[in-house]
Structure formats: C-alpha cells, structure tokens
From Swiss-Prot:
EC number: 7.1.1.9
Cofactor(s) this protein requires: heme; Cu cation
Binding site for O2: Y4
Gene Ontology cellular component list: mitochondrial inner membrane
Cofactor binding note of this UniProt entry: Binds 2 heme A groups non-covalently per subunit. Binds a copper B center.
Binding positions (Mg(2+)): H128, D129
Protein's cellular compartments: Mitochondrion inner membrane
Oligomer status and interactors: Component of the cytochrome c oxidase (complex IV, CIV), a multisubunit enzyme composed of a catalytic core of 3 subunits and several supernumerary subunits. The complex exists as a monomer or a dimer and forms supercomplexes (SCs) in the inner mitochondrial membrane with ubiquinol-cytochrome c oxidoreductase (cytochrome b-c1 complex, complex III, CIII).
GO molecular function, one term: heme binding
Encoding gene (name): COI
Function: Component of the cytochrome c oxidase, the last enzyme in the mitochondrial electron transport chain which drives oxidative phosphorylation. The respiratory chain contains 3 multisubunit complexes succinate dehydrogenase (complex II, CII), ubiquinol-cytochrome c oxidoreductase (cytochrome b-c1 complex, complex III, CIII) and cytochrome c oxidase (complex IV, CIV), that cooperate to transfer electrons derived from NADH and succinate to molecular oxygen, creating an electrochemical gradient over the inner membrane that drives transmembrane transport and the ATP synthase.
Catalyses which reaction(s): 4 Fe(II)-[cytochrome c] + O2 + 8 H(+)(in) = 4 Fe(III)-[cytochrome c] + 2 H2O + 4 H(+)(out)
Transmembrane segments: 28-48, 65-85, 98-118, 140-160, 174-194, 212-232
Name used for this protein in its record: Cytochrome c oxidase subunit 1
Organism: Choristoneura rosaceana
Length: 274
C-alpha cells in the first residue's frame, strides 16, 4: 500500500493549486475526490500479489489480483478527470505552479496507463523485473510525486517566505526538467519491451543506444535541479518582497501578509461555503 499512500499528499497539493489557479473555490466533484482518495487507500491493501505474478499462483488468484489492481485505476481516473473539469471554462494562466500541475496530470496519467498494462498477469509474466516496470513507477513517482512536490514548493514559496522567485527562470527550469525526466524514463519502456532486466550492473550491447539517451536525460535533469537551487538562491539574495499578491482569495491562507504574521486573527475565522 505504501506507493498508493505516497501520492496522496501530492494529490491534495495538486487539487489546491489547480482550484486556486482556476479561480474557483473548490475542485470539481469535491466529495467525489475525497471518496476517490479513500478508495485508493483501501484498495491498496488488497492488491499486494500483483508483484508476484511470476511465482506460480493459480489462475483464479491471478484473475482476482489483476482485476483488483485495475480497479485502483478507476478512482485515480476520477481524480484526473475532476482536475480537468476544474480547469474547464477558465482561461488557463501558465504560471510556474500551473505548469507543474499540468505536467503532473499528464505524466501521472502516462504512468497510470503503463500500470494498467502491468496489472494484466499474463503480460506481467513477460514484463516482470524488466525496465518496463522501472519506467512505470518512475512516471508515477519521479514525475507524479516529484512534480507535485515541485509544484507545491513554487506555489507556496511566496507564502512561506514573502519573496518572489523569478517566474521566467522558473518556466525555463520546468521545461528543462520536463525534457530531462522524459528523455531519461521514456526509453526505458523500449528497453523493458526488449527484455532488459532490472538490477543488473551491466547489459548486452544491443541496449546501449537507449541507455545512452536515458543517461543524457539524467544529465539534463541534474542541470535542471541545479538551476532550481540557483533560482531559490537568487530569490533569497535579491529579496523581491511581495507587496500586492494577485492571488484569487479562494483560500483563507492568502488573506494575510506574506509571510503571515504571528497572531493574525483576533478571533477564530468563520468557515463557510462547504
């Protein structure tokens, strides 16, 4: 269940970012989003043997674990389409945090599709312990969870520090990172389909070309990561203090000064619009 729980904080951040950047007070299908996360969390406990399709389970067991694993894709898909429905009808503002969110939705979907493919026990017998699995879980983790973390960081950095990062550099950094991670992990689908196994330190020469491209992508990602650190450093050095936030006040946290002062409220704030 660990990997399904791992993505839940990311889901929450993406919901916050997308609803706020859309200028809406909540996501589409707010209650359905909550039930979807509960369903993902609960189903995560009854699908463990999808890691064990190659150990010789009988056909009924394989059929069950294939089906149960695929059912996890349903609430996940509900979340994806609810985010898209939240964006519907708004003029999309391609701010850095919005770019990270859109990148998250797209790449997490790609990782989810390869996950549905791997859920098939008959196919998984061939693909088990190949780089296809590595490509799958890096699309949902290195481009799902990490993109959510990056999106959350650039979105709430002004709230935590009261300083602005350079949005132009942030966009350059996003696209550099996007190209880097895709160049790293997309060829691994091909390596897996060609039968390259996981957890070996060396490989036959036939796999060299895709591995070179994958390595090039990792260098690009490294450059993008260093660029991000440089952007944070530049922000802290130049101290561009935010005087007039342009945020839609769909959330109470943006009403205060940035960063919020101690004892901001004389009384408990009233919650409305459930």
């Amino acid at each position: 269940p660990e990997v399904y729980i791992l993505i839940l904080p990311g889901f929450g951040m993406i919901s916050h970012i997308i609803s706020q950047e859309s200028g809406k007070k909540e996501t589409f299908g707010c209650l359905g989003m909550i039930y979807a996360m509960m369903a993902i969390g609960l189903l995560g406990f009854v699908v463990w043997a999808h890691h064990m399709f190659t150990v010789g389970m009988d056909i009924d067991t394989r059929a069950y674990f294939t089906s149960a694993t695929m059912i996890i894709a349903v609430p996940t898909g509900i979340k994806i389409f609810s985010w898209l429905a939240t964006l519907h009808g708004t003029q999309i503002n391609y701010s850095p945090s919005m770019l990270w969110s859109l990148g998250f939705v797209f790449l997490f979907t790609v990782g989810g599709l390869t996950g549905v493919i791997l859920a098939n026990s008959s196919i998984d017998v061939t693909l088990h312990d190949t780089y296809y699995v590595v490509a799958h879980f890096h699309y949902v983790l290195s481009m799902g969870a990490v993109f959510a973390i990056m999106g959350g960081f650039v979105h709430w950095y002004p709230l935590f520090t009261g300083l602005a990062m350079n949005p132009y550099l942030l966009k350059i950094q996003f696209f550099t990172m996007f190209i880097g991670v895709n160049l790293t992990f997309f060829p691994q689908h091909f390596l897996g389909l060609a039968g390259m196994p996981r957890r070996y330190s060396d490989y036959p020469d036939i796999y060299t070309s895709w591995n070179i491209i994958s390595s090039l992508g990792s260098y690009i990602s490294l450059i993008a990561t260093m660029l991000m650190l440089m952007i944070i450093w530049e922000s802290l050095i130049n101290k561009r203090i935010i005087l007039f936030p342009l945020n839609m006040n769909s959330s109470i946290e943006w009403y205060q000064n940035l960063p919020p002062a101690e004892h901001s409220y004389n009384e408990l704030p009233i919650l409305s619009n459930f």
